[in-house]
Regions:
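Metalloprotease/metallohydrolase-associated module, dominated by Zn2+-dependent proteases
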Residues: 1-22, 26, 57-111
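Short pre-active-site segment immediately N-terminal to the catalytic Zn-binding motif
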Residues: 21-44
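Residues at structural and domain junctions
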Residues: 30, 50, 75-76
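Active-site recognition of the HExxH zinc-binding catalytic motif
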Residues: 42-54, 90
Length: 111
């Protein structure tokens, strides 16, 4: 099995991270979820895709690029968050449970 498809993630439930209004956030391959949040398979797959992206680029570089892209997209029309390349890949494929088995390297920047 492809290493990208077999991504186990630790889940930490708490009442601080993420902020209210969000159910989960992936920080360095660890899911932080609110106590009351239901983590569907779709949400978990979305976060698995982010973990694959992080491992591919390295955690620090992932966050540097993510932040820069978000700041640039704030100046452009549309939803800055949803238009970040990492988020587009994750949202477009979060319902495909086999996506990580066939994901190509640097898929977030491929058409």
């Amino acid at each position: 099995m492809n290493y990208k498809a077999n991504i186990d993630m630790k889940i930490i439930r708490n009442s601080i991270i993420p902020f209210k209004g969000f159910c989960a956030i992936n920080l360095f391959g660890v899911i932080f979820a609110r106590h009351e949040a239901y983590l569907s398979e779709t949400v978990l797959n979305h976060e698995r895709i982010h973990t694959a992206q992080m491992k591919e680029l390295g955690y620090v570089l992932f966050y540097v690029i993510y932040l820069i892209e978000w700041l640039v997209r704030l100046l452009l029309p549309g939803n800055a968050y949803r238009n970040i390349s990492f988020e587009r890949e994750a949202y477009n494929n979060q319902r495909n449970s086999f996506y990580l088995e066939r994901r190509k390297s640097f898929a977030m920047w491929r058409k």
